[in-house]
Swiss-Prot record:
Binding site for Zn(2+): H269, H333
Function: Catalyzes the synthesis of the hydroxymethylpyrimidine phosphate (HMP-P) moiety of thiamine from aminoimidazole ribotide (AIR) in a radical S-adenosyl-L-methionine (SAM)-dependent reaction.
Protein name: Phosphomethylpyrimidine synthase
Cofactor notes: Binds 1 [4Fe-4S] cluster per subunit. The cluster is coordinated with 3 cysteines and an exchangeable S-adenosyl-L-methionine.
Gene3D superfamilies documented for this protein: 6.10.250.620, Radical SAM ThiC family, central domain
This protein's pathway: Cofactor biosynthesis; thiamine diphosphate biosynthesis
Length: 436
C-alpha cells in the first residue's frame, strides 16, 4: 500500500476502494471527492482493522450523516441489549455508531461491535481509562491515556473523540467567564478534573504529535471534541466555546500536515438564532473541516422530548452547512435510552438530516419526496408506506382507524381533497352525502 491514510492517498491521487464506495453511494465524481479529501473538507473514517465497514463520506457536498450513541455503563451493563441497539441502528441505515461504554467489559463489547458493524464506529477513549486500569482518575499517567487510545485504534474503531482543545489557556478563559452550566462534556469534565488534580497541561494537547502517530498508523480519524460546548442556551457562543474552537482550528492544520483526517465536534445547547453563526465560525476557524453537532438542542425545558428539540436544531445546523448529526433520544438528560428510545432518536435525526439535504440542494435529495407526493396523489397507500421514513409506525397508525372508503383516511373521509380532485379532473361526480 503506497499511502498511510485516506487523506494521504487523496493527496497522492490514489483512488482507494473506500473512495470508490463513497463515490458510488453519493453520486459524486471521484476526482472531486479526492480533491475535497485532500483539502480536509471530506473525510472517510475507515480504520485499517475494521474489515466489515461499508465506507461513508462526511463533509462538503455529501448527504448529512447521522450517528447513534450507545454502550454499556455501570448501571446498565447488558452487552446483549446494546448489541440489539446496534442491530436496530444498522437496520435503520444509521451511518455511524459511537460506543460510549464506560464500565465493565468494554473491550468485549467493542470487539463484537467492530465484528458486526457495517457502520463506521467511534469511541471516546477517555471514558474507558478509569475502568481499563482500575485506577482513580487522578492516578492515570500520560502514557496510560495514550495506551488506551492506541488500544481502541488497534481494535478497529474508525474515529475517536479527543478533547485536545481544552488546554490551560482555555481553562483560564473558562475561569474568567462565568457559565450557568460550567463544563457539561463528560470527557471534557474528566480531563479538566485530571488537569486540575495534577496541575498538568492536557496530555492530548501537550503531546499532540504522539496522538497523530497513532492516528496515522491505523488511519484513525480524529474527531476533535468540544469539551466546552454549551450545556445550556445561556452559555452558547461564549468566550470559552470560541476560545476552544480557535485552538481546534490550529490543531486541525497540524493534523492535516500529518495526513490525519479531522472532524470538528460542536454544540450542544443553542438558541435557534445563533446556529447559523456557529456553523460559519466552525467552517472559518477550522478551515472547512467537517462539522459534527450534538443537536443543537434549541430549548432547555423539554426533557422527554429532546429528540424534537435536537431535530429542530440539527435540521437548521445541517442546512447551514453542518455535515454530521449526533442523534438525541427522548431519554436524553434522564436515563440510558432503551430500544424504543433509540428508534425514535434515529427517526427524528434522519428527518432532520434529510430536510437539511433538501435545503442544501444535495443531488437527488428531493427524489423520494416527489415519489411520496405522487403516491399520495394516486392514493397508493402501499407505496406511501414503502417510502415512509418509518414505515412501521405509518402502517400501525393506518390500521388503528378504518375509513369508510379504503382510498381515503378517517381524517377527511369523503371530503378527501385528493380523492375528490382526482374524480373531478377525470370528469366524474363526487358524492359527499349520498352513497357511492
Amino acid at each position: 500500500m503506497n499511502y498511510t491514510t485516506q487523506m494521504d492517498a487523496a493527496k497522492k491521487g490514489i483512488i482507494t476502494k473506500e473512495m470508490q464506495v463513497v463515490s458510488e453511494k453519493e453520486g459524486i465524481n471521484i476526482e472531486t471527492l479526492m480533491n475535497l479529501m485532500a483539502e480536509g473538507k471530506i473525510v472517510i473514517p475507515a480504520n485499517k482493522n475494521h474489515k466489515s465497514i461499508s465506507a461513508e463520506g462526511v463533509g462538503q457536498g455529501l448527504r448529512t450523516k447521522i450517528n447513534v450513541n450507545l454502550g454499556i455503563s455501570k448501571d446498565c451493563a447488558n452487552i446483549e441489549l446494546e448489541l440489539e441497539k446496534v442491530k436496530k441502528a444498522i437496520d435503520m441505515n444509521a451511518e455511524s455508531i459511537m460506543d460510549l461504554s464506560n464500565y465493565g467489559k468494554t473491550y468485549d463489547f467493542r470487539k463484537r461491535l467492530v465484528e458486526v458493524s457495517t457502520a463506521m464506529i467511534g469511541t471516546v477513549p477517555m471514558y474507558d481509562v478509569v475502568g481499563f486500569y482500575d485506577k482513580e482518575l487522578k492516578d492515570i499517567t500520560v502514557d496510560e491515556f495514550f495506551e488506551v487510545v492506541e488500544k481502541h485504534a488497534k481494535d478497529g474503531v474508525d474515529f475517536v473523540t479527543i478533547h485536545a482543545g481544552l488546554n490551560r489557556e482555555t481553562i483560564e478563559t473558562f475561569r474568567r467567564n462565568k457559565r450557568l452550566t460550567n463544563i457539561v462534556s463528560r470527557g471534557g469534565s474528566l480531563l479538566f478534573a485530571w488537569m486540575e488534580l495534577n496541575n498538568r497541561e492536557n496530555p492530548f494537547y501537550e503531546y499532540f504529535d504522539r496522538l497523530l502517530d497513532i492516528c496515522e498508523k491505523y488511519d484513525l480519524t480524529l474527531s476533535l471534541g468540544d469539551a466546552c460546548r454549551p450545556g445550556s442556551i445561556a452559555d452558547a457562543t461564549d468566550a470559552v466555546q470560541i476560545k476552544e474552537l480557535i485552538t481546534l482550528g490550529e490543531l486541525t492544520k497540524r493534523a492535516w500536515e500529518r495526513n490525519v483526517q479531522v472532524i470538528i465536534e460542536g454544540p450542544g445547547h443553542m438558541a435557534m438564532n445563533e446556529i447559523e453563526a456557529n456553523v460559519l465560525l466552525e467552517k472559518k476557524l477550522c478551515h472547512g473541516a467537517p462539522f459534527y453537532v450534538l443537536g443543537p438542542i434549541v430549548t432547555d425545558i423539554a426533557p422527554g422530548y429532546d429528540h424534537i428539540t435536537s431535530a429542530i436544531g440539527g435540521a437548521m445546523a445541517a442546512s447551514y452547512g453542518a455535515d454530521f448529526l449526533c442523534y438525541v433520544t427522548p431519554a436524553e438528560h434522564l436515563r440510558l435510552p432503551n430500544l424504543e428510545d433509540v428508534r425514535e432518536g434515529i427517526v427524528a435525526t434522519k428527518i432532520a438530516a434529510h430536510a437539511a439535504d433538501i435545503a442544501k440542494g444535495i443531488s437527488g435529495a428531493r427524489d423520494i419526496d416527489n415519489k411520496m407526493s405522487d403516491a399520495r396523489k394516486r392514493l397508493d397507500w402501499d407505496e406511501m408506506f414503502s417510502l415512509a421514513i418509518d414505515s412501521e409506525k405509518a402502517i400501525r397508525y393506518r390500521k388503528e382507524s378504518t375509513p369508510e372508503h379504503k382510498d381515503s383516511c378517517t381524517m377527511c373521509g369523503k371530503m378527501c381533497s385528493i380523492r375528490n380532485m382526482n374524480k373531478i379532473l377525470e370528469g366524474k361526480d363526487i358524492n359527499l352525502l349520498r352513497e357511492d
